[in-house]
């Protein structure tokens, strides 16, 4: 193997080790990290917005509806895929957005991400959690 190929393999290995693994189960948070960092980004990554949400010991943070967002997560037992939906009509316009929740909820680590066809579909699927 050439020196260039060896160096490239070493860089890829280092990057793979640095990228967090997305676990299907939640695990306890052992460090001082608290709350969730919620983001919504455009499908082409031309824009992103984010906000911190803390649910323990009480809803707080700059999220505009921290109480509603925490209540929605509590009802879903911390699983954004199980949020109670807020159905309302949406256009079929394809303008994808990706929602992400990273951090901790009630002491459990979370790294969740999902792409929706547009902002309206995101809103119907996630209710107050990503309304910021």
Descriptions of predicted regions:
Residues 1-98, 102, 108-132:
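N- and C-terminal low-complexity/disordered segments
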């Amino acid at each position: 193997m050439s020196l260039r190929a060896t160096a490239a393999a070493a860089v890829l290995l280092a990057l793979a080790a640095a990228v967090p693994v997305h676990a299907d189960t939640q695990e306890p948070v052992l460090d001082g990290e608290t709350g969730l960092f919620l983001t919504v980004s455009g499908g082409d990554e031309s824009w992103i917005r984010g906000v911190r949400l803390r649910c323990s010991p009480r809803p707080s943070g700059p999220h505009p509806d921290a109480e509603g967002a925490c209540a929605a997560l509590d009802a879903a037992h911390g699983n954004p895929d199980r949020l109670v939906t807020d159905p309302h009509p949406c256009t079929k316009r394809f303008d994808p957005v990706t929602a992400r929740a990273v951090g901790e909820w009630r002491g459990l680590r979370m790294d969740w991400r999902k792409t929706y066809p547009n902002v309206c579909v995101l809103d119907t699927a996630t209710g107050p959690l990503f309304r910021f």
